[in-house]
Amino acid sequence: MGNKNAIYILRFLIYFFIFYYILKMLEGNIMDLLTITLSKLLNLKFYKNEIIVGKNIIEISSPCTCSLEMALFLGYIFGTPDVPIKYKISYSVFGLSIITISNILRIILIINYSNMINYNVVHDVISFIIFPIALFLNWFWIYLLKMKKIIMFK
């Protein structure tokens, strides 16, 4: 592994842990915002971080915030060497918006289809969607940087 690759991995890890720590501190607030947003969108009642769906209760818990996926995404973006900060910030706002909207849609699908089939099956199958979205955003980041000739690969 070249020195440049080692530096990139180190930068990625540092940024990942910084963003993960920040997001973990905000996780309770993010859960509250998700609960309120989802209950308003679906016209459902809620209590704390629980949404009442008929006779069932769906809890919006820590993994529902996508903190890990967001931190991985941000670590990747901010760890990218030789890219001006303005591009990193702009793309981070774009990417976090996509992840958040996808997450809200994911939870809506879980809520809507959890009554039809086994809840755990629905949850596990639909929850898989966020990770490929984050991977696509990382690929698209490099694609944009190459297209704009901000970074060059050999």
Curated annotation (Swiss-Prot):
GO annotation, biological process: proteolysis
GO cellular component: plasma membrane
EC supergroup of this enzyme: hydrolase
Active site: 64 (acyl-thioester intermediate), 106 (proton donor)
InterPro entries, alphabetized: Archaeo_ArtD, Exo/Archaeosortase_dom
Residue runs in coiled coils: none
Molecular function GO labels: peptidase activity
Family per record: Belongs to the exosortase/archaeosortase family. Archaeosortase D subfamily.
Name listed for the protein in its UniProt record: Probable archaeosortase D
Gene it is expressed from: artD
